[in-house]
Amino acid sequence: MQRPRIPTLLSAFLTLLNDRLSESIVFPLLPFLLARFAPDGRTLGLLAGSYALAQFVVTPLIGALSDRYGRRPVIAICVGGSVAGLGLFALTVSLPWAESSILPLLLLFIARIIDGISGGTAATASAVLADISPPDKRARTFGLIGVAFGLGFILGPFVGGQLARIAVPLPVWVATGFAVLNLLVVLNLLPETLPVQSRRDLPRKRDLNPFARIGQVLTDPSVGRLCAAFFLFFLAFNGFTAILVLYFKQRFGWGPELATFAFLVVGVVATVVQGVLIGPLVKRIGEWRLTLIGLVLVIVGCLMIPGVGSPERAPAIFIAVAILALGTGLVTPSLRSLVSRRLGREGQGTALGSLQALQSLGSFLGPPIAGISYDLLGPVSPFAGAAAVLLTVIVLVSGSPLSESTQNQA
């Protein structure tokens, strides 16, 4: 089993990297890619939300299929789907279309949904790493997940911004090329890591229903408030970040290079916080206080962005974005840890899976709400609305049953 370990690690790592890289290339450029078809906030929000909706619905099924039929075929099909979705998106934004045609918008939504359905590769590639790692080395192997995601978040905006200077659709074609390379590596190097004797039957339909999972944790008095806070945090955060580039484009006249640089700042700061700082900070301050500090930082960053009133002060945006990334890097792992600590070991899988479902649901609902608000109430409204929701999150976390005990332990 030692000989295939390196190609297996390479295949899993490339799959995880491609999952983050392709999305962080495409997402910041959506307002520029949509400019010919529908440059409004509502369409942008719906397009961003459609990707998350597909992931929300399909991810539990993809995980179950990989447990039943093996990791390799599921990863290959998902990466192939990513090639199809990205390729369709790239082709659609590259072709000339009549101004009155709704076909390109329809194709863009189909492409994003296909790519979202294929997003289950991250969970299955993580399962590959678990399959090939003994328990005492699993944490070190799982560090590859953070490295891959961090590289993807950093390289994606940089690559997208630089290539968009040549032609706005070009980054999507390059993302498609990365996905093709990923597929070739999977087909040629990735062995099956789940033995036949370890495979499971497909679960009941109810167990694949993401809403059923969510209902279980939200009605649990011990973690319900924290899980509601987790959902509201991602609802607010994914809402205003979905229209962030559109705001930069319309308010300051930024092009793709400057707009994607803001997301590059997010990637660098978030990677440093979650990869280097979060461990020592948790030991020193505790998860509960870190969550509240992070929420305050996100609110400050969120309100700073519309506070920059003129293009001459636009560099202050990067400070606000860095504060946002710092706060998010503190909140996400700390809030997950609070839920995890409150539950017994036997409830970990269900709870953490439910948190992922809540995150996906917030990522689906947030962008359309923010986009509609942007169009109807003005460009500042998504930021003000997000700040109000985040204040509610602070109230929920402060009043959770964990507050007192966690404070004492910290």
What do the predicted segments below correspond to?
Residues 28-42, 242-259:
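Short amphipathic helix-loop junctions that connect adjacent transmembrane helices
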Residues 1-5, 191-228:
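Juxtamembrane intracellular "pre-TM" segments in multi-pass secondary transporters
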Residues 59-70, 273-287, 374:
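Helix-to-loop junctions at the C-terminal end of transmembrane segments
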